[in-house]
Amino acid sequence: MSRATLYRMFPGGRDALLEAYKVHELDEFFERLGAGIRTIDSFEELLIAVVVGATRDLRSDHHLAVMLAAEPGSTIESLTVESLPRIIAMATSFVAPLAERFVDRDTARAATDLLTRLTLSYFLAPSPVVDLGDEDSARAFLLPFFSAFVNPPTHV
């Protein structure tokens, strides 16, 4: 079946089909991510597990790889300009309540926002220095950020 035929079969056409697919994939992504993080017992370990798990999941997503290869510009745009607010909102609604076991609500939301942006940025433009898919590398890179959230500097 051709793409055009598929688009015609889906009410709303191509854009509606792609939007439904994005929502489905985000739901699946957070379900996979949640499997291993609900029992973690510290703020730092929770956020490291989220970043490492998200990075690994993004890297192993076959459909995302195909989309990036076939239409890199529109795929990157859909992960940044178009969908970033929704991705951050979904990440916040999923991760922040788990982080609130360790820190206040505002800190949990700010940390989730920052780490979502970092994770997507490092996925789309990998660093030769930091590998957020590697637990040790992610921990070494992220711990200074966490200490700033948990122990904010006092201003005189």
Where are these regions (language model features)?
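C-terminal peripheral helix-coil segments that are non-catalytic and often amphipathic
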Residues: 89-101, 113, 118, 124-156
